[in-house]
């Protein structure tokens, strides 16, 4: 600071400035970026920035900004800035140097200069020296010394344990044991014991159960110094996390000088610092000291001591001011600069550089600057920007898949619910007729046989055959002539619309006019649209040409205009413009069209794609190219590209329609600006250049026989409107081409048709004038046009007849509608507008007056406060359960399959879930079929991404329950979630640019790779611990020299020349787009504990989340409920993975090699089955098989196939299936090396957004896009699903895996899955495919089995004596089991698997036949569809061949779903996500389209059995789907799924209604549970222990009938005594049971009674299981004892068990032969007691016992037998003689 006359005032100003800045900082939002830019950029350069604060945060930010943005500018201006922090640079700030002693100063006295030992020379009085005053110099405050304490054993124990369990030292209680802190993880516990043993060289017995403090007390011989383990941790901390040069010595020095810690306390702090290790290496010393400060601070709190850090700059109130003579300072600077300049000259001479060339370079730069300044003065930035080139043929979008859009439109039309008559009038209908092909006719012929589509199909078929479309595509204008209509309604609102023009016939009749009639009408003796020919210098009306033109219009409105084979360039065809309608007409006529756009292709591609899909006719083609008509280079490059045969299209243009325009509204002659010049350049100058470039190309190639037709867009506006810049001049300038046609030499190459464009309503230039159009027509007798009408006019000018004339002479087409020549046009328009506005205001005033009058007459309106605010819809997030209507509705139209299907071996899906780039299956489905999120979708994703969380408590002093913002804690209304977070959600979900924080910091722009280098010079010495140094020596041998450091355990290391190092390098990797999970996704939000998340690979937590959610989808609140119905060994876990735990594998290989911290048990997490193990340990607790398939991309299908096999072979009854894989850099890099994935860099250069880069079946596809996640299904036997009352989403009818062939390419797609259609020629005629035939054969087999059962039962009963009565039940059950098994085998043989009888039938056909379906009933094919060239074609070929071989009806194509266009390719999870999507399609009847398939590859046109929808199609219902998956390594898979309604046709109405009721009850119960747990973050319910105790484990495992019971708390566990439960195998009906008992037991009872000589009485009872109401608590309490209820509660089927006991009580009562007390008498006095495997015993109480005693009954025996629908009991009462 320069010394002023009044130093105190300067100090006061500085003080005030500092206070103001700090006040501003605290009071207002931080705007540091703007502030620092202003400070750095200002003219009076600031060279010294000082930050006052606890650390150098802002100084570092400013330093980075200056280096990044102002480095070159500072270099030119020789600016050298300093960035200092008050916390770290106090000495530099106060100019305090090591050799300088602090200056003492007295209070309130100015600083005096120090006395000199020699007298100073006298100074001139008139010129006092200017002095430079330095800042006040503080007195340093020393750190307070703290008594030193030795490092204790407990410090080391806590440090080692805390480091291992990843907690800070002060978060580990010394009173807890290692076992407690390990949370039951034996591996972690074992590892800790091993480390402590290595550290202390011996541990006491049972160390894991001792408190840490007790354990530490055993180490009485502890040396007070870190041992092997602790020392290694400290060394690793310093080596891996401290900045360069910040070694142990510096750490200790800092702790001593700044905190006053002694050597031993420093060691303790280092030990504790290990437990707080930073996540990455600290950037600089400032961060390192901050880290140490935080450790010391927490250490002080733990040690109970007050630690005070030395103040860096504590100073007295005043201090001395050092003064330096300014003249001396300037002299010193001058000498330094001269010296540096001499050094520069010497170095330049030595290096052979031109050291004096700089002035000339400066001069050149100055001249360039002057030229730029002159340009800016003449034009401006807008003009320069407007001329920039944007033409890039790589960004071209090409559309030519008319064949697929026609098929797609026909399918959508047939499935549309609108009446056929309405469809006939639609543009889609007319477009289909124009795009006719044999394939469409075949599709209609097939649909005409279907009742749901018959009417539409036959009508369209008749129309097409009658119209004769064999002549090729035409553009036919079918719209009525439209007129503008402007109305002012009663409220004063101006309403504009367009209505058909009508012609009156008498008073009450009118007819709609066609457009040709309207334009042919006369106006001033000429039609509204007419042609003129040259007459001297003028253009005169030409009758002959006009008649020709009007005839062409009539033809275009009737038979149509053909443009087949024409090649046209159109510039300026935005949405709603005339150009867009011209393009539509050309495409409908079969033309090849190039359209240019000045916008990014990704912005306009959707609209052009839709345009082509609507009208693109056979042979038509649309190419969209970026192009700026204001750029000369673009004009030249565009035409060159069109004509170039090598790199371009090799076209010769038939027409050019240059309609590109730039609006200049509001610019009069005094406001002509650069935009006007730019518009003039685009609409005139460069339009002429375009024509010139075409002429050059045609002349170069000798194309002088086919002139290109030029449609000039002229205008009747010759300044009439005014205020439109140079627009009129641009249009008038084009008219010179009429004369140049003759005066210049290009008439052989170009012909001119000038079209004067009339008033066209609704276009960009004229839309503001729509409301005055009617007034103009009425008052001036002119004709205005709609955009389609004007386009029709222009398309008629492109006919061959008109062109023939134009070849010889330019044509002038007046399409102005009479507007040309109207005088005072602007005034007339203004008058009409003024009248409309006036009418509007008058009516508004009348309305206001009327309201005021009503208010006066009827009183005031109700207070606003009484008006209820509008209700806002709330989100309702719930599992998407399948709808269940009544039995007749569900089975309507289906063949009856009752009793035909073996349900025990039929696989159904009862639950599913997923986790992927679009979140859950619910949110993914919304995006997949709708392309947008609902309120529920936004809410769920906002929760999933951590943007909101649920709150229940006091918020701002008021009770509040609902969502709050996770950061601000402000309440969030669900209706506002889309507005608040919508853009963030859409930007951070789905396929997008990789976010490093979601992939462990992986940034593809800095992909790290190791590079080997050999050093050629000795490196500077560095300090390292002894052990590390010896390791260097061991690796590098004599290339490393070690030198001990006196007084230290460390050594000095010198690396000699010749040593080989691996040095990291970074490179940009071009695969930087992927489908990551939504940003902010956190497994702890689901309820997974943090220690589990830290332990396992991310892929495992994906599986845990998905399996947990799949249970809710199945209606299961607790997975243990499954064990009420199955044995724990009957649940299989078949979830697979393609690659396994990538992060865990990285730890095993890379991180371990790089000596980074890695958990010791990382190996277990890298195993493929680790996720299955964790799922079972934390959630399922099953003892069934764990099968871990790895089928690369087909893993999920292989998992499903394994599960189906397990259920069908009765090895399991329930299975968890699916797949999971992660996205990490290693696999991404290797897929890129294989060229399998899309090159994101190339894709961006082509103009594709990240979300568009996965384009299955598109002609532009270039590889798949990786993604990550998991997909899960819960499958089980249909029998079990019906028994449990679980929702059934679909039937898995068939699954198969297949290899391919001999080869050398592992990833090559194969055709092995063709074998699913393997079939002989005659097999399709097999009677086994006839349901009725199979039913007859099955009935025969079942009847035979029933006869056998009846015979055996009679034989058994007849031979059983009363003494053997107790064994009767078991023997009968055995017979029933055999019979039931034989019936199921018969069902399996005659229905489920008819290929056992005839293996020549195709597996797919046989699977469909089970349900009465054929291959024609498969409606949807979910494709693997990876977006690679090879896969998509191969997959289409395979499916098409299968359908052809199986004789699928031609004209009945499959609708193809390509899900990966939305999700990317998750490898292992792919098939599971696809399967989930298919289940959702079955449930809704919706087939989602592939929105990224902008143009389906023409190579797929040959596959007639396939349609590739790009838009969603709503069907009336889907019967069946097929899914294919192709994985690297010859893993082909196929699954066929069927709608669940076909399963319900196999059961009776009563059984279905019972099932339906239980399913609905289950759903009603689970939905609030799901929502509550989601809000509370407890979706994942971790299991702490199995359903059995350790004592029960053996009994549970060995008892096949062991089942859990539900406790009063709702939990499931095995009863204390695991008793056998009655088998659930019997399959007799009630009628069978009654018949058997009536015939068999009668004989047995007679024999028994006769044998007992009359002392036995018998009771028999049969009860329907469904008749016993187990929900009636009063009934249960009156009739059953607590013991009976407890036993029944623990049985697999509580209702069946209670029904059996009720039948037994009734039978016993009958056997006692005592008087009845009525039907309502309680039965509690009769108790049935079960004792394990023994027959039940009977206990009588109270009145029942008294009655039995009176009857001298000494013993009562009972036998209970169950069937699926009934319970039967026989009781024998034996009396005393």
Curated annotation (Swiss-Prot):
PROSITE patterns: KS3_2
Name of this chain's protein: Fatty acid synthase subunit alpha
SUPFAM superfamilies: 4'-phosphopantetheinyl transferase (SSF56214), FabD/lysophospholipase-like (SSF52151), NAD(P)-binding Rossmann-fold domains (SSF51735), Thiolase-like (SSF53901)
Region (Ketoreductase (KR) domain): 563-803
Residues the record lists as binding Mg(2+): 1661
Domain Ketosynthase family 3 (KS3): 1007-1539
Description of how the protein assembles with itself and partners: Fatty acid synthase is composed of alpha and beta subunits.
Catalytic activity, EC: 2.3.1.86, 1.1.1.100, 2.3.1.41
Active site: 1193, 1424, 1465
Region spans: Disordered: 101-124
GO BP annotations listed: long-chain fatty acid biosynthetic process
Reported function: Fatty acid synthase alpha subunit; part of the gene cluster that mediates the biosynthesis of oryzines, natural products with an unusual maleidride backbone. The two subunits of the fungal fatty acid synthase oryfasA and oryfasB probably form octenoic acid. This fatty acid is most likely activated by the acyl-CoA ligase oryP to give octenyl-CoA before the citrate synthase-like protein oryE catalyzes condensation with oxaloacetate to form tricarboxylic acid.
Domain of life, per lineage: Eukaryota
All residue ranges annotated as the Carrier domain in the record: 151-237
InterPro entries from the UniProt entry: 4-PPantetheinyl_Trfase_dom, 4-PPantetheinyl_Trfase_dom_sf, ACPS, Acyl_Trfase/lysoPLipase, Fas_alpha_ACP, FAS_alpha_su_C, FAS_alpha_yeast, FASI_helical
Residue positions, PTM O-(pantetheine 4'-phosphoryl)serine: 186
GO MF annotations, alphabetized: 3-oxoacyl-[acyl-carrier-protein] reductase (NADPH) activity; 3-oxoacyl-[acyl-carrier-protein] synthase activity; fatty acid synthase activity; fatty-acyl-CoA synthase activity; holo-[acyl-carrier-protein] synthase activity; magnesium ion binding
Family: Belongs to the thiolase-like superfamily. Fungal fatty acid synthetase subunit alpha family.
Pfam family, one: ketoacyl-synt
Gene Ontology CC terms: fatty acid synthase complex
Alphabetical UniProt keywords: Fatty acid biosynthesis, Fatty acid metabolism, Lipid biosynthesis, Lipid metabolism, Magnesium, Metal-binding, Multifunctional enzyme, NADP, Oxidoreductase, Phosphopantetheine, Phosphoprotein, Transferase
